[in-house]
């Protein structure tokens, strides 16, 4: 089989899957559209937003410590990779979170994402968790800088075509 030289057209073709929406039927009369494949740039955007959410909440007088971190991660997936139109401002985002996580629809939406995409998220969060052990001795500003650097590394690493695991 003849090999093709990589060009912009081939790159565009390979990333087209990230723009495709998929209809997920939650009940007989309720559906949602999701973006089943997590593009590295949108995943980075989601993780970066998650990092700043706690500070934004505290700035608005919201007690973010009462929010379950795992559920917030899943909620952030739904926010970034569905068409629910969850707002960006932290007060309304928290309001949506509190309602959505208690709904019957939340686990249905989460379970509709492909395992491949969830693995991508798991790998990204694992890399972030790895650095948190060192964060206890760092200032808040140093922590945020380091996390953002690692998120950028993850974005760059997940875009590699070598087939090696990062």
UniProtKB/Swiss-Prot annotation:
This is SPbeta prophage-derived uncharacterized protein YomO. It comes from Bacillus subtilis (strain 168).
């Amino acid at each position: 089989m003849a090999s093709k030289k990589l060009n912009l057209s081939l790159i565009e073709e390979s990333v087209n899957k990230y723009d495709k929406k998929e209809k997920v039927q939650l009940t007989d009369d309720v559906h949602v559209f999701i973006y089943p494949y997590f593009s590295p740039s949108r995943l980075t955007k989601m993780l970066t937003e998650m990092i700043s959410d706690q500070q934004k909440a505290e700035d608005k007088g919201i007690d973010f410590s009462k929010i379950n971190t795992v559920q917030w991660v899943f909620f952030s997936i739904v926010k970034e990779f569905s068409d629910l139109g969850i707002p960006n401002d932290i007060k309304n985002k928290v309001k949506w979170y509190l309602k959505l996580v208690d709904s019957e629809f939340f686990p249905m939406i989460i379970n509709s994402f492909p395992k491949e995409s969830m693995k991508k998220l798991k790998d990204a969060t694992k890399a972030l968790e790895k650095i948190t052990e060192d964060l206890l001795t760092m200032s808040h500003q140093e922590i945020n800088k380091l996390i953002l650097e690692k998120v950028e590394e993850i974005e760059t690493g997940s875009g590699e075509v070598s087939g090696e695991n990062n």
